[in-house]
Amino acid sequence: MASRKYEQRLRAESSEATRRRILDALEQRLREAPTEPVSMDEIATRAGVARTTVYLVFGSRAGLFDALTTELWDRAGLADLTEAVAHPDAREHLRGGLRAGVQIFAALRGVAVALFSMSALDPESVGGAIVRQEERRWGGMEYLARRLDEQGQLRADVSIEEAADVLWVLASFASFDALYTGRGLTADQVASTLTAMAERTLCRDVEPATDA
């Protein structure tokens, strides 16, 4: 029995190591040549496995890109974003969420450019992975807009729908990269700029604190 469990553990470790090599190969390939199409044969060769192994591990080309995008976002700081969303104050949720999103994009900038660029050329695999990430992001924007409204933070002339649209634009990779790459701002400066834009556009003025 002990021998069987040991063999099962070795097989599991071997499977995880294979999965890791394939994901690492894809990430490295995207960083090296972000504008060139990705071939499964090339990824298999880089990972030192057969092409069929890639499909056995991930099910499909789309499954491979889904797994990579999920891992990249997790590794880059998704936990910080989750923490921001859980903050009881909607305004702090807004600030922390934008800050965490910017840090994720900054950490992933090279690969993110490749993924977003390739999504239009490869809509079924790369595009599908990005679409699913963006759908989750949109859900987050709607949730934040509702929270701001429920806590009386939205300006009277801004609807929940309008707030969600504005947040969607400001929290996008395109907005981040326009400031980070286009203007040469640091990640902290980008986060501060986007947060200021969001609060000035959407939120009521905060009453200054007064001494009791």
Predicted regions and their residues:
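Hydrophobic/aromatic-rich alpha-helical bundle segments in the mid-to-C-terminal region
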Residues: 149-197, 205-212
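Amphipathic alpha-helical packing segments from all-alpha helical-bundle domains
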Residues: 103-114, 125-151, 161-165, 192, ...
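Short, basic, alpha-helical segments at the C-terminal edge of helix-turn-helix-like DNA-binding modules
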Residues: 40, 69-77
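Hydrophobic alpha-helical connector segments
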Residues: 67, 80-107, 164
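DNA major-groove recognition helix of helix-turn-helix
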Residues: 58, 68-69
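Basic, helix-initiating cap at the start of DNA-binding domains
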Residues: 1-48, 56-57, 62-63
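Key DNA-contact positions within bacterial/archaeal DNA-binding proteins
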Residues: 52
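Short helix-capping/turn signature of helix-turn-helix
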Residues: 58, 117-122
